[in-house]
Structures are given as C-alpha cells and as structure tokens.
Design a protein with these regions (language model features):
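N-terminal subdomain of nucleotide-sugar transferases
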Residues: 1-64, 254
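Conserved donor-binding/catalytic core segment of Leloir-type glycosyltransferases
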Residues: 4, 225-251, 263
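Carbohydrate-associated surface elements
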Residues: 41, 179, 200
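Membrane-proximal helix-turn-helix segments that form the acceptor-binding/catalytic region
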Residues: 96, 115-118, 122-127, 153-175
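A short, well-ordered alpha-helix in the C-terminal region of glycosyltransferases
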Residues: 124, 377-392, 405
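Nucleotide-sugar-dependent
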Residues: 242, 293-330, 337-348
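Nucleotide-activated donor-binding/catalytic signature segment of Leloir-type glycosyltransferases, i.e.
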Residues: 265, 272-299
Length: 409
C-alpha cells in the first residue's frame, strides 16, 4: 500500500516531536508499505527544524520519505495562522502533482487543525485513494476553550467549516481520543466511521536494561536517602497544563505523613510557584530535582512507588486524553493518581490507579493516602495491570496494523 501522511508538525528522532507519524510510518515501512509524509519546514514543537531551501525538498528517514514545504517561522497567532494557510494552500495548489508522484492508496490528514482535509480529499479523489482524518485534538473547540476565541471569530468559523467538511466526506476518522465519537457524529460523521488508535510505545526503548541505567548522582543520593519511605513521583515538564501545583499542595496537606515523600523531576516555567509553596509552608516532605534525558525516565521512575498525572479543569478531557507520560508510568508498573476530568479513563478501565477530579487537592491527597496505606505487594499488583495493558495493546507495531485494517478490506 502507498500511504500519504499529511502532518504539518511531523518530527523525527533527529528533529524532535511530533513523533506519532514517525513511529506509525516506521512500522508500515517494516511491513512493506511505501510511506510519504508531507510536513512544514517550521514547527514550534520540534527541537530543531530542517533546513529547507525549496518546496517539495525530500529527505529519507528510516525508510520513510519526508517531503518538506517551506513555511514561515512564527511566534504569535497571526504569523502561525499565515503558516497554516500557506501549508494548506500549497497542498491544494499542488494536489495533482502530489497525486501523480505518490500514487497513494490511503491519504491521511493529520495536522491537528482540520483544514488539511480539503487538499487531502482532493488528492485522494485524484488518486482513487481512501481518505482519513486523524484527530489529535478537537478543533476548533480546543482553541475556543483554551484560547477564548468566539465561535464567530473568522478563524474559528473557517476551522469549523474544515471540521464539518472532514466528517461529511471522510472514509474513516482515526482518533487518539477514545471518547470523541459522539462529538464527531454531532458534527456530521456517519455511523461506523469512527476508530480509536491511541498513542503507543516502542518496545525497543523499554528493554529491561533501561531501568538499570546510571542516573545523575544528585538524583541517586536523594533516592538512597528516602529508602523505607513511600515515594510519590512526577517526572516531566513544570507547566500550568500539567497542574503539578496541585501535587505540591497535596504535599502540604500530607506534611505530617513522615512515611510519604514527594519527588518531582523536571523543569519549566511553573517551578518558582512550587518553590514558593514549599518555602511558605516549610515543607520537608518534597524534593525537586533537575530534569533528565528521556532515555533515563525508566531508571528514574523505578524509584517511585506512586505516580501522579494531572491536568486543569477542561471539558475537552471528557473526550479522552492520550498522555505519553501515562504510558511511561504504566510501563514502570506504577499505580497512578490521575487528577484529570476524564470519566472512564484508562486508569479506571484497567484498574491501575485512582482517578480524581482535576485541581481537587483534597481528593489527590486522599488518593495518595489510600495507595500509601496499601502494602507494597498490593500497589505492585495494581501497577502490573497497567504494564500488562500497555504491552498487550499499545506497541506501535500493533497500532500501525490496527490503523490500516479498515482500509484493507
């Protein structure tokens, strides 16, 4: 099968995130498929962007053909919108060229925003290919709720037209969000066209030796000093979206539990607010450590007894979430306290932790106490449920196969 993957923000191991298109495409190439990914030369998500001198510049990455369209750099909203519109227009204008060169059997529109569905469908029609819309976030609902845009804003109205266009014409919707089907149907998607393919993991990155890698001396010294205590851990970015401040405030509530210690590993703009709470409350039951490379996350997580994953209040979370950090914790057999407004989340479905309301410090503290008061064996049994679920259901090889099944019948 020839697969054309349109992903404005596509990344790679060299450039950084976004990784999902790379991992799926790598598995498809292994299975004998031909994959072309079209992306923009500029993305705010990448660690570094490719040097692109002209449109349709090509690059081979692990057997995947990357095709770059030149895009303007951006920081603010206006220049980002210009970047989006330029990318979509170049696809639309060159649809015949792309169809002839790629000869796709399947066209995937996957650029977060829905406007790339218009050129994706055109290319599919010119090629006689199937066409699917891959949903990462629900647009334009996400920028409306997060950015405060009115539904009458011209940008939002254009994006709403793009979303509705996709649901009307698509052969299938592939969603990272497990509970988004009702929303899609409300906007016009026909019955039987919704498939959930969440984010996955690469087993090669989680071999047992990863857990034994040497971590920085500063980190090892802290963990050595906490032997005998129940460690509640978080490893990741200190951003407002992760609502780590609620975990810090839970440490305030549990400061008299001398058997429980909080360890946070990371960096980010919210760090000063955490340090302020720690200083004001004279906390001795929490330690903040510098971030570590992604390769050391298993070796860090193995020292935790309980993991925390949080979010802010958002109705968007009711449609489902797809946190890579969740998978990391589950692969480490950690029981999870998930403070996200996601009823029926994987934590609840699998039974690998406790889900509570987002930003509810008392509920977070109570969940931690409940897990801390379990025996070590009980916590490990709970954590193993998560690991077994991920290993069975979320290898990229399986997800890549599941992705193509609806288009191979």
């Amino acid at each position: 099968m020839n697969i054309l993957y349109i992903e404005h923000y596509v990344g790679s191991p060299t450039y950084g995130m976004e990784f999902r298109p790379y991992y799926l495409s790598k598995e498809w190439v292994k299975a004998g498929h031909q994959v072309t990914i079209i992306g923009s030369s500029f993305s705010h998500l990448r660690q570094r962007n490719p040097i692109v001198n002209m449109d349709f510049q090509e690059e081979m990455v692990d057997g995947i053909r990357y095709v770059w369209l030149k895009g303007n750099a951006y920081e603010g909203s206006i220049s980002r919108i210009r970047n989006i519109l330029s990318f979509v227009w170049k696809l639309q204008r060159n649809a015949m060229r792309i169809a002839k060169q790629c000869k796709p059997d399947l066209v995937i529109a996957s650029s977060t925003y829905p406007l790339d569905n218009i050129p994706a469908r055109k290319i599919a029609r010119l090629s006689g290919a199937k066409y699917t819309y891959e949903i990462h976030d629900i647009w334009p609902l996400s920028p409306m709720l997060i950015g405060g845009y009115s539904k009458y804003h011209p940008f939002i109205r254009v994006m709403q037209w793009g979303e509705d266009y996709a649901y009307k014409h698509v052969d299938k919707v592939v969603s990272l969000l497990w509970n988004a089907e009702d929303h899609c149907k409300e906007r016009g998607l026909a019955d039987g066209k919704f498939v959930c393919i969440p984010n996955g993991y690469n087993p090669e990155e989680w071999v047992s030796s990863k857990f034994d890698l040497e971590i920085p001396k500063e980190h090892q010294t802290v963990f050595d000093s906490l032997k005998g205590k129940t460690i509640v851990g978080f490893a990741g970015g200190f951003a407002a979206s992760g609502n780590v401040i609620s975990l810090v405030n839970a440490a305030v509530q549990l400061k008299n539990r001398t058997d429980v210690h909080f360890v946070m590993v990371g960096k980010g703009p919210e760090l000063p607010s955490y340090e302020k709470v720690i200083e004001e409350n004279k906390l001795t039951n929490i330690t903040i450590l510098p971030s570590v490379p992604k390769s050391l996350i298993p070796a860090i997580n193995k020292h935790f007894d309980i993991a925390h994953l949080g979010g802010t209040h958002s109705v968007l979370h009711q449609y489902g979430t797809s946190y890579n950090k969740m998978t990391d914790y589950m692969l480490c057999s950690l029981p999870i306290v998930q403070s996200v407004d996601e009823p029926g989340s994987v934590v609840e479905r699998v039974g690998c932790g406790i889900r509570v309301e987002a930003e509810n410090v008392e509920a977070i503290a109570n969940a931690i106490v409940k897990l801390a008061d379990m025996s070590s064996e009980e916590r490990k049994a709970m954590g193993r449920k998560g690991k077994e679920y991920v290993e069975k259901n979320l290898p990229w090889s399986k997800l890549a196969e599941d992705f193509l099944k609806p288009f191979q019948s």
